[in-house]
Amino acid sequence: MTVPAALPPIFVVNMARSVERRAHIAAQLAAQSLAFEIHPAVDARDLSEKTIRELLGEVALQPQPFLGRRLTLGEIACGLSHLQIYRRMQRDHLDDAVVLEDDVDLLPSFGSVLRALAAEPRFEMVLLGHHSARHGPYVGAETCLYRRIVHGEHRVARVCEFAMGAYAYFVTTGAAAQLARYAEPMRMPADWVTGYAPSSGVRQHAITPPCVVPARRFCEASEIGSRDAAAAVGNRTTRRLGGRAFLALRKLGFFPGLYSKGF
């Protein structure tokens, strides 16, 4: 009899005061019989410029060329929360993990997709929820044409355009270490770190269509700001590199991570 592969630990990024969000995501995970752990998120209300300097140095407080502005306190808090998980994975010698933010909806297929990925451990990073300048969260970012069946309608393939959203992804500890090095000094939001993962040396894949989407009930009250606000500036560069001809080549598998160069 084949023994089912162990699922990676699921870390839910959640602030202590975000009780409604915690209940929202906990109920969904319980409904799919998935164990999880709440990772105490850094609260932007607890951050001061002095604290940020002590934790991250001066760079995080400076205007960022690609953004055209400083990082917001919410973006810094979110980035720190994801960094903490990457470091914990290394400290605790985990093989891999799933990172979930608390303001998402899990599709009924989420658990089955995770089990299928766990049964075939060959990916460094897989975006479970994502969107792009071209497509919304129910379609997801563009991926290469060569796709492997994961479960039902869901396929996994290399990402070939800037994927927005760090709200749901699988990552190995080796890839998490590369992302942590790439993220410092902090100069970009968390979903730029994941979106431009190829620049850190990580082979990035995505599930299409995504099996996790932003929860509409929480979109208006995001602590970070609009999920697309930070990406809007960066996508001017993405579009220059990502014209239709270049995208077509990347979809065929020719340098699919080329969109991330320069970040």
Model-flagged regions — what are they?
Residues 1-100, 104-263:
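An acidic/histidine-cluster motif and surrounding catalytic segment
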